Amino acid sequence: MRLLVLLTALLTAGPLAAEPVDFTLENLDGEAVSLSDFRGKWVIVNYWATWCPPCLEEIPDLVQLYEDNRDTLVVLGVDFEEVNTEYLREFVDSHFMTYPVVRSEPLPVTPLGPVLGLPTTYIISPEGERVARQEGPVTREAIETYLERKRGEAGDPAAKSADAASP
């Protein structure tokens, strides 16, 4: 039932922006990471925190989603709390978070829209447009179902390039 509610929320989310959005935050090595660095791929922007139980529950699904779809999408974790970098790096390593993680410090940065609770996830199209938003946990299955639907609607350039690269 929870999956059905989540899937419905993602599927019924209308376009959130008609033009590309961008932001730049620092990763755990202090390097700048911009949303526009990932143009041409779907981006799953996930606001989370180490103290948030629902955030921790969705990490394995997000890792698997990222690992299985690196050619067509990226998961970008945005840590939405004030903790020191070494603690955060150890946390990320201990939870096998292989996708990029950036910090929303020094101030909470929410350029995609409101973050009223954690986790909050935005889906960004390969063109850089916000196409969906979900408050609460997401699952790999719900995201994949949503992306399959969106790819079928619009002739997704990321899907086309992945198809061209396939044998």
Residue ranges and their predicted role:
Residues 14-35:
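N-terminal "domain-start" segment that seeds a small globular fold
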Residues 90-97, 103-148:
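Thiol/disulfide oxidoreductase modules built on the thioredoxin-like
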Residues 20-21, 43, 118-119:
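Short loop/turn microsegments at loop-to-beta-strand junctions
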Residues 3-14:
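Bacterial N-terminal signal peptides
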Residues 56-95, 106-110:
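Structural microenvironment flanking redox-active thiols in thiol-disulfide oxidoreductases
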Residues 155-167:
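Non-globular targeting/processing and membrane-anchoring segments
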Residues 36-53:
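Short active-site neighborhood of thiol/selenol oxidoreductases, capturing the structured segment around
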